[in-house]
Amino acid sequence: MPVNHRFTFSYRLLFLIFLLSFETAQRLVTGDPNDEACLTNLRQSLEDPANNLRNWTKSFFINPCSGFSSYLHGVICNNGRIYKLSLTNLSLRGSISPFLSNCTNLQSLDLSSNQISGEIPPQLQFFVNLAVLNLSSNRLSGQISPQIALCAYLNVIDLHDNQLSGQIPFQFGLLARLTAFDVSNNKLSGQIPSNLAMRNGNLPRFNASSFIGNKKLFGYPLEEMKNKGLSIMAIVGIGLGSGIASLVISFTGVCIWLKITEKKMEEEEGKISHSMPVY
């Protein structure tokens, strides 16, 4: 019996389309397991006294995304995957779970203006697509992991107003796309990496405001700001010194004038007494 090759090809094509459709439908129902693990672990590591994450439940973690939207507060999706987490100013406490890195498609992470403590997990290095990292205004401590610089697409690193210590990793200066950098008001020490402070013409790559508030941090552009401060103090000192010197000279002049005047008056009195007739 002759085989109808056209029929066989059509059958195989339909079967392939069915499999792809079934797989897509299954993903839409269950979501991505990496995103589910990411959200589950992050929720377990955070405390939510204001109950802002009340809909962060397991039933939603199974399928957090519906195309480009999500029912979860602070979660933004793109093509069925989480690509942005924005949980800013929600009074959150706790720590950042290292398993947050399971959100492998994440491009923006903003946990700013909370009360999150602990260290910044080095596992954030696995966010290969991450462009924005904002963990500012929290209570994060410990050293900044240089491994975060493995996120080659980073263009924003904002860690200001925390309790971070140690040195600024020089690897951050190797991030070619980095356009915004702020580690001010921490407990950082050591010299500012030259590749973060290098000049672009007459301007530094990042100015002093990116580094201020770290008492043991030094180097350009902080040194220039300190020198300007010293110059102002010197000017004030010179002004005060000049004023005091002028007062001393004036006072001395008055004293000398009074002394001379007193002596002249005594001489005049003597002359008058000699010229008066004796009766």
UniProtKB/Swiss-Prot annotation:
Residues 1-31 form the signal peptide. LRR repeats lie at residues 103-129, 131-151, 152-174, 175-200. SUPFAM superfamilies: L domain-like. Residues 250-279 are cytoplasmic. It is found in: Cell membrane. Keywords: Cell membrane, Glycoprotein, Leucine-rich repeat, Membrane, Receptor, Repeat, Signal, Transmembrane, Transmembrane helix. It holds the Pfam family LRR_1. GO terms for cellular component: plasma membrane. Belongs to the RLP family. This is Receptor-like protein 57. It comes from Arabidopsis thaliana (Mouse-ear cress).
